[in-house]
């Protein structure tokens, strides 16, 4: 199992293939990530590596975290994430992981935080239909019935209603890597990924490959 990498969403653009067909892509600035911890089955019960990303000033982190990063001679890093692997012996503390761990045509899963849209109604949040807009109707965007009467005498848990929309962890699976720019540590991924430009992304090899 190959490990993943952390990156920052830069935005969307389009590129053209050999046939002149436009392909919408998201440009992601990935890494370089520093290996800050190596876990093995003998000592931790499972094999994994922890990587750090996003250099910041040391005063932005607390002392325990700075001490943890010092063990790998890593600078002050904002984000830490652990990736499971079949064998952690292939990695060493302080090793850099860059965009070249992926190749063009590879399928990846992209994990990020969706854009927060604040308090939203049922039409926008849950894709509900609306009521009549004329002929004296007073039920334009109302939610309608939310349950029965005296029995059960309550609203069932999980009932879809108005509330905060977005700002949650989202995984988009099996996106294709169109191009890898190893010199500038850029990935061009086909389609859209969660979040707004500047948001943090985790990119891992696709877990479910096939139809």
Curated annotation (Swiss-Prot):
Pfam families: Ribosomal_L3. Gene3D superfamilies: 3.30.160.810, Translation factors (2.40.30.10). The keyword Ribosomal protein applies. Signal peptide: none annotated. GO terms for cellular component: cytosolic large ribosomal subunit. Residues 122-157 are annotated as: Disordered. One of its GO terms (molecular function) is structural constituent of ribosome. One of its GO terms (biological process) is translation. Keywords: Ribonucleoprotein, Ribosomal protein, RNA-binding, rRNA-binding. The keyword RNA-binding applies. Part of the 50S ribosomal subunit. Forms a cluster with proteins L14 and L19. Belongs to the universal ribosomal protein uL3 family. NCBIfam families: L3_bact (TIGR03625). One of the primary rRNA binding proteins, it binds directly near the 3'-end of the 23S rRNA, where it nucleates assembly of the 50S subunit. This is Large ribosomal subunit protein uL3. It comes from Trichormus variabilis (strain ATCC 29413 / PCC 7937). The gene is rplC.
């Amino acid at each position: 199992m190959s490990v993943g990498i952390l990156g920052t969403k830069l935005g969307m653009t389009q590129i053209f293939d050999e046939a002149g067909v436009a392909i919408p892509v998201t440009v992601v600035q990935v890494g370089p990530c520093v290996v800050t911890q190596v876990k093995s089955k003998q000592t931790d019960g499972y094999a994994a590596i922890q990587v750090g990303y996003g250099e910041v000033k040391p005063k932005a982190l607390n002392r325990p975290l700075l001490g943890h990063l010092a063990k790998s001679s890593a600078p002050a890093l904002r984000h830490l994430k652990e990736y499971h692997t079949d064998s952690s012996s292939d990695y060493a503390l302080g090793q850099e992981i860059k965009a070249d761990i992926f190749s063009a045509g590879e399928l990846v899963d992209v994990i990020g935080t969706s854009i927060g849209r604040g308090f939203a109604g049922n039409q926008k949040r849950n894709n509900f239909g609306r009521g009549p807009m004329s002929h004296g109707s007073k039920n334009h965007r109302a939610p309608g019935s939310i349950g029965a009467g005296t029995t059960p005498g309550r609203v069932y848990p999980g009932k879809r209603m108005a509330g905060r929309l977005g700002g949650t962890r989202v995984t988009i699976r099996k996106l294709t890597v169109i191009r890898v720019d190893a010199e500038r540590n850029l990935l061009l991924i086909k389609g859209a990924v969660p979040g707004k430009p500047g948001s943090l992304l985790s990119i891992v090899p696709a877990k479910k490959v096939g139809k």
